Each structure stands twice: as C-alpha cells, then as structure tokens.
C-alpha cells in the first residue's frame, strides 16, 4: 500500500471509532453514506472507495453543488462483514441518509440491499460484482462495476485459449464473490472442452495453504485460478513459490491490490488478473488524476474511479430528477446516460451497467500492471 493510502487508512480507522465520520461543506446538504470496510483484512478496498467518492464530493461542491445544495459524505465501517453490514444499513436508515455509495464486498452488500430497498434508500456499489445483488427486482440498487458473469467468462476464455495444454486448478474462498466467479471460470473452461483437474475451496482468513499446494503439486497443476481476495492470493503465491510449485496464477479484480506485493513479494511477478480498464490512463481524466496526485492519493486503485463515478451519477441523477427523492432519482438513472471518468454510463432495469469491460492484466512485483494483448 502506498504512503498516501496508509495515511487514509489510519484516518478512516480513527474516525470509525465513533461509528461514522462526516464530510460537510454547508448547512444545506444532501448526505451520501460511504459504506465499506474501514477496518478488517480488505480495508484497502474501502480506502479506494472513499478516496474516489470524497474527491467527487469535493469537486462537485466546489462547482456549486447539486441544485443549490452541497453534498456531504458520511463514512460507515462494515469491515466487509455481512452482519456488520446489516447494522450499518440500519444506522444509515436511522440517520436519515437517502443515498449510499457502497458497500464494497458482495457478501456484505447483498444483505444491506434488502434494508435499503425496503426503506427507500438508493445504493450504488462501485465494487460488488455478484449477480445476485441486482437479480431480485429491486428498483433502488445499482452498481458502477461489471458482474462476475461478465468477468468470469473473460478469464475462462483467456485460460481456454492460452493454457489449454496445461493442467488447470480452480480454487475459491467459499464466499459469495470468490466461489461465484470461480464457478463461472470453471464453467467457461469446461464448455471449451478443457478439464479442470482440481476445483476446491479454502477458508478465507487461513494462513497456511501448504497442504493444498502439495495436492496441486501431486496433481501436476500448471495453472491456478483463484476466486477471492488479495490476502489469500498473496499467501498462495508466496507459499507455492517456496514449495516449488511451477504454476501460473490468475485471479479476479479482488486480487488487484498493491498490498498483494507486500504479501507475496517477488512471487507476485507475473500474476494475471481480470481488472476494469485502466481509466486513470485515459487522457480525458488527466486533470482528475492530477487532483488525486496533488493529495498524494493513488488514482489507479481499481475501485477509486468507479466510486467517483457513483457519486457523479447520484449528483446528476438528482439534477435530472429535480429533487433528492431516491425513487425519482432511480427513474432518472434508468432513463439517461451519464458522462463519468469511467465512461458514459447507462443502467438497465436491474440497475446494472449496460456495458462494462474487464481486461486481462499481468501484475508486476513493483505493484504496476501491464495489459495482456
């Protein structure tokens, strides 16, 4: 994690002791809850979400706000824990907040959506990719990221085309996000007529995967796909290298975090990952990227600009609706497209983006990435 992100983590964690933190620029405000992990093993993804959302709030307010009102960001910590996410969602409702950017993890997002939909709160997640989140006919739930059933086939087709002669294992962390995307990858690979030699789950939070790695070695595995997050992937990479497992590793956007390099060290070199397009490299975003850098913040984090876009969409939706009524804003979101740093975004009836691309990148030990052509 870069120094700017580390400072953000400490700041947000300190604020979370009180339950939430508020960023306000005027008495007449529209509150937006920023719900995600301030603490816990994947707090780095919450840092990305908050950095992007708070930058959008700051810039919108400097430009005059929304329909004469200023935006206010209110931080809530769910630690990416489903039970804590339910408590956060109830607090958001009790605090009278009508808009949410979050949650971050799919497993914590889904139970929170039930509360938001019932209580008339509009939510946009910049990071939760499980298809089930938007599959229940809800009208107030949206996302500015693609789905596992978009991302999984991208990885599966890549594996089938480039590693069809290798012995393949597909692993997952037994959680909604990780197991869901691993299942999509397995299905895509097998639909191409290629056998998956090992399909197995591990326990998120475990630290020792040597028994599993020994099993992979005995099976002659040469390529490993892991559905899950960077803490487990980093340990898998490091322990596989130490055990002499000669295999290429690949994962979803949940592994694309600079912290994985701190965990895996040189073993992170060459890891493959499906990630959103590198929006920070788009020339049209140069002024925005410079604004992040002026704050010593890293705009390349995979959820930074999707979170910025989520706030942008809420603000423009309120302008289109003419008022900060979540139901009317939801109608405006489905009826329009919105120019954002992550493209011109339009939403379908489910609240999903009509278009979103995942790209295969190669990870490097200095925490940079290169698109695989």
UniProtKB/Swiss-Prot annotation:
One of its GO terms (cellular component) is outer membrane-bounded periplasmic space. Keywords: Amino-acid transport, Disulfide bond, Periplasm, Signal, Transport. One of its GO terms (biological process) is branched-chain amino acid transport. It comes from the Bacteria. It is found in: Periplasm. Disulfide bonds join 80-105. Transmembrane segments: none annotated. Residues 1-26 form the signal peptide. It holds the Pfam family Peripla_BP_6. The keyword Signal applies. Coiled coil: none annotated. PANTHER family: LEU/ILE/VAL-BINDING ABC TRANSPORTER SUBUNIT, LEUCINE-SPECIFIC-BINDING PROTEIN. Belongs to the leucine-binding protein family. Component of the high-affinity leucine, isoleucine, valine transport system I (LIV-I), which is operative without Na(+) and is specific for alanine and threonine, in addition to branched-chain amino acids. Binds L-leucine, L-isoleucine, L-valine, L-threonine and L-alanine with nanomolar affinities. Can also bind L-homoserine with high affinity. This is Leucine-, isoleucine-, valine-, threonine-, and alanine-binding protein. It comes from Pseudomonas aeruginosa (strain ATCC 15692 / DSM 22644 / CIP 104116 / JCM 14847 / LMG 12228 / 1C / PRS 101 / PAO1).
């Amino acid at each position: 994690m870069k120094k700017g992100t580390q400072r953000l983590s400490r700041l947000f964690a300190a604020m979370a002791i009180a339950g939430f933190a508020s960023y306000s620029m005027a008495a007449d405000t529209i509150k937006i809850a920023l719900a995600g992990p301030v603490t816990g093993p994947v707090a780095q993804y919450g840092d990305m979400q908050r950095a992007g959302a708070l930058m959008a709030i700051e810039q919108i307010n400097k430009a005059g706000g929304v329909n004469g009102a200023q935006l206010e960001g209110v931080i809530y910590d769910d630690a990416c824990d489903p039970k804590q996410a339910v408590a956060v969602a109830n607090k958001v409702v009790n605090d009278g907040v009508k808009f949410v950017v979050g949650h971050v993890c799919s497993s914590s997002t889904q139970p929170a959506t039930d509360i938001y939909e019932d209580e008339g709160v509009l939510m946009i997640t910049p990071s939760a990719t499980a298809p089930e989140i938007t599959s229940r006919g809800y009208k107030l739930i949206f996302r500015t990221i693609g789905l596992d059933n978009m991302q999984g086939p991208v990885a599966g087709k890549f594996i089938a085309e480039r590693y069809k002669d290798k012995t393949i294992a597909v692993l997952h962390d037994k959680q909604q996000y990780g197991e869901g995307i691993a299942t999509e990858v397995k299905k895509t690979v097998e639909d191409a007529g290629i056998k998956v030699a090992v399909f197995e789950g591990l326990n998120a939070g475990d630290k020792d995967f040597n028994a599993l790695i020994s099993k992979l070695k005995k099976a002659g595995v040469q390529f490993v796909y892991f559905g899950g997050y960077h803490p487990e992937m980093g340990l898998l990479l490091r322990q596989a290298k130490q055990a002499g497992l000669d295999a290429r590793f690949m994962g979803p956007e949940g592994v694309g975090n600079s912290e994985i390099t701190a965990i895996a060290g040189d073993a992170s070199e060459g890891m493959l990952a499906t990630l959103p397009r590198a929006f920070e490299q788009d020339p049209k975003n140069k002024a925005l990227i410079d604004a992040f850098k002026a704050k010593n913040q890293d705009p390349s984090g995979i959820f930074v600009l999707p979170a910025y876009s989520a706030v942008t969409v809420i603000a423009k939706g309120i302008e289109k609706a003419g008022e900060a009524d979540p139901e009317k804003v939801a109608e405006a979101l489905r009826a329009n497209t919105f120019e954002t740093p992550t493209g011109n975004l339009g939403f379908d009836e489910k609240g999903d983006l009509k278009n979103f691309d995942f790209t295969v990148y190669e990870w490097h030990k200095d925490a940079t990435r290169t698109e695989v052509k």
